[in-house]
């Protein structure tokens, strides 16, 4: 039942100007209040301005379905609570059609559980069990006909006993969506088998991702991973349908599980690439190729790769016992 219950307010009228204040009501078992609601008649329209807030309440699925037209079956709201404070303005024509809607909201959520199955995450994060818990989430939300903006921060838990932090910002206008994400990864054990890299749990690490989407393509301006003296950075990466359309730079500077220091840069110059560096352990790459049951090669991750790569690496490790110097 979506009816408004227990409606109370103060009301005053002047010429073409309606003012309501101290509005209290209950909707879907949640108590809301509004300090003011102003309705002003101007020519052939009504201009509406007001605010709306609620104190700490439990989230119910009926409210989520009503607002988002989606019951988000992969999110568990059973123990979730939220606090909100919003301001809004809009115009209402004689046919009661809303125009020029603007909303500014501050939302606080607690105890959201996301069910997300991903073999890719499992490949990188040890003991990932398809659940991510979010607590103490603070979200700012702005909406207008031209732009949608959401930014915030939250604690997140892959292991229910250990928290990490996430910060994010998403801005959408027309067909373009910008995104910024910053993740603290201290309490995760991370394994990247293709480059023989491992991060131990409790070691400080961060991941920063900036980019945008446009016409189904994903552009990563920067992907920056840091853990102590280890660094992995990608610049200007463009992806479509899980294929790489372009990448301008890759920088690898890390100690791998075999205690070998990888220090190389892949840099695009016009349509070709140069691969330069002090040292690179190719053991894992060679093993992956030799043990593969597929005829696919590395370059099939690219869409129409048609470039030459000039290589100049001081030291390349081929296997446990063999190292090539001045590889070019």
Which positions does each model-derived feature cover?
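Membrane-proximal interfacial segments on either side of biological membranes
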Residues: 1-328
């Amino acid at each position: 039942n979506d009816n408004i219950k227990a409606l109370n307010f103060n009301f005053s009228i002047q010429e073409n100007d309606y003012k309501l204040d101290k509005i209290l009501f209950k909707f879907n078992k949640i108590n809301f209040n509004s300090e003011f609601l102003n309705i002003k008649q101007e020519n052939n329209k009504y201009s509406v301005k007001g605010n709306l807030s609620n104190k700490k309440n439990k989230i119910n699925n009926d409210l989520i379905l009503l607002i988002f037209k989606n019951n988000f079956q992969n999110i568990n709201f059973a123990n979730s609570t939220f606090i909100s404070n919003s301001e809004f303005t809009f115009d209402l024509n004689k046919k009661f059609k809303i125009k020029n809607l603007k909303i500014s909201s501050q939302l606080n959520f607690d105890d959201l559980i996301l069910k997300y199955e991903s073999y890719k995450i499992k490949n990188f994060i040890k003991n990932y069990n398809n659940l991510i818990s979010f607590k103490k989430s603070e979200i700012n939300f702005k909406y207008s006909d031209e732009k949608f903006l959401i930014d915030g921060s939250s604690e997140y838990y892959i292991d229910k006993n250990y928290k990490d932090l996430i910060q994010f910002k998403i801005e959408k206008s027309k067909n373009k969506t910008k995104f910024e994400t910053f993740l603290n990864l201290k309490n995760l054990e991370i394994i990247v088998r293709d480059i023989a890299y491992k991060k131990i749990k409790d070691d400080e690490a961060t991941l920063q991702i900036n980019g945008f989407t446009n016409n189904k393509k994903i552009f990563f301006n920067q992907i920056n991973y840091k853990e102590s003296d280890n660094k992995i950075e990608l610049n200007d990466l463009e992806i479509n349908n899980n294929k790489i359309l372009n990448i301008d730079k890759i920088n690898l500077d890390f100690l791998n599980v075999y205690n070998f220091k990888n220090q190389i840069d892949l840099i695009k110059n016009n349509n070709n690439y140069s691969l330069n560096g002090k040292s690179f352990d190719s053991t894992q790459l060679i093993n992956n190729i030799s043990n593969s049951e597929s005829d696919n090669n590395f370059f099939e991750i690219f869409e129409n790769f048609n470039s030459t790569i000039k290589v100049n690496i001081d030291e390349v490790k081929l296997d446990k016992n063999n190292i090539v110097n001045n590889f070019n």
